[in-house]
């Protein structure tokens, strides 16, 4: 444990040394799940923004378009927005032109919770991102930041597994993970996705069965880096105080090899099928810890904190130590 604590402090210092942080001053509440945005029109997006503004202002209803299908697309986008946890229930009016909201909290509680979530997200992002980072470096930096921010909530999982009615079990969302410092696989995925959305990096979600038990579900992100899609699993890479890269940047075949016999997964995406074909990040998988050096390279370490090599984050070349 002492080795890991020393190494983590070294990694953080290396990632921050000599460079001012690129400050985000506010969260973009208008972000849309990437694949959902793909089937929304520009007009849908404007109504979506209008609805977000209405929720933030605690309006009881918002007037949408006269097109019911378009309004369903807007609702689909809303349901994937991290601030939507403040809405307990929504319903359309009889003409399906207005969306009415019932809020889960008082006005002051809602404002406090959203402000807290924004503050914690900004702190996490600004504490990890440096000016000039490319997409891979941003993805790596936020991977480390998410793993450092929350721990896996085994008590929650045990309670879920023993619950008589899982549909009534409290919903997982970002605020819950940030406020408790704990979460499950969905929490890691949602946090990672939301952070990357703020940085303009495309992130989707995979759902699947990773243990051979069809009732034992799992969720993890897929990230688009340099035009290629890669599967990542921050839940499995959580080493307690830092992230390993054993499951970062996997191809579909590498992901299949990481599970057990009968392992299946599918993309929780309106895109349909997304291929993760590239294996050029495979050298990263040997790292039990890493540090971004600031010159477009990642220093990889083994479980004892010994440097094992350097990975070029631009060319994806690896030089063993």
Language model feature labels by segment:
Residues 2-22:
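Sec-dependent N-terminal signal peptides of Gram-positive bacterial secreted proteins and lipoproteins
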Residues 18, 22-136, 140, 257-321:
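N-terminal accessory/pre-domain segments preceding catalytic cores
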Residues 39, 112, 180-183, 207, ...:
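Alpha-helix capping and helix-loop boundary segments enriched in small/acidic/polar residues
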Residues 110-177:
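Secondary-structure boundary elements
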Residues 117, 138-139, 184, 188, ...:
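Hydrophobic (often cysteine-bearing) scaffold residues that line and stabilize catalytic clefts
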Residues 174-186:
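A short, highly charged nucleic-acid-interacting micro-segment common to nuclease
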Residues 187-255:
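Hydrophobic/aromatic-rich core segments of domains that either
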């Amino acid at each position: 444990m002492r080795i890991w604590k020393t190494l983590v402090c070294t990694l953080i210092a290396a990632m921050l040394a000599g460079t001012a942080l690129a400050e985000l001053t506010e969260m973009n509440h208008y972000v849309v799940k990437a694949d959902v945005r793909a089937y929304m029109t520009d007009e849908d997006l404007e109504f979506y923004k209008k609805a977000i503004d209405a929720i933030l202002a605690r309006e009881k209803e918002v007037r949408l378009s006269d097109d019911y299908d378009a309004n369903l697309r807007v609702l689909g986008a809303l349901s994937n927005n991290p601030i939507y946890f403040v809405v307990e229930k929504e319903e359309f009016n009889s003409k399906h032109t207005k969306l009415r909201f019932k809020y889960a909290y008082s006005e002051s509680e809602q404002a406090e919770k959203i402000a807290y979530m924004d503050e914690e997200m900004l702190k996490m992002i600004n504490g990890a991102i440096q000016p000039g980072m490319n997409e891979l470096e941003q993805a790596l930096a936020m991977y480390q930041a998410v793993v450092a921010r929350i721990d896996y909530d085994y008590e929650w999982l045990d309670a879920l597994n023993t619950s008589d009615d899982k549909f009534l079990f409290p919903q997982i969302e970002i605020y819950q993970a940030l406020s408790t410092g704990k979460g499950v696989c969905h929490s890691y995925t949602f946090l990672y996705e939301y952070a990357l959305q703020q940085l303009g990096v495309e992130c989707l979600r995979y759902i699947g069965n990773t243990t051979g038990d069809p009732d034992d579900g799992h969720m993890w992100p897929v990230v688009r880096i340099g035009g290629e899609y890669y599967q990542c699993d921050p839940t499995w890479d959580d080493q307690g105080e830092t992230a390993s890269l054993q499951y970062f940047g996997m191809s579909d075949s590498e992901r299949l090899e990481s599970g057990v016999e009968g392992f299946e997964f599918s993309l929780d995406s309106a895109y349909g099928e997304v291929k993760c074909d590239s294996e050029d990040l495979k050298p990263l998988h040997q790292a039990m810890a890493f540090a971004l050096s600031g010159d477009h390279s990642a220093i990889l370490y083994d479980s004892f904190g010994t440097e094992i090599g350097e990975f070029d984050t631009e060319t994806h070349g690896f030089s063993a130590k």
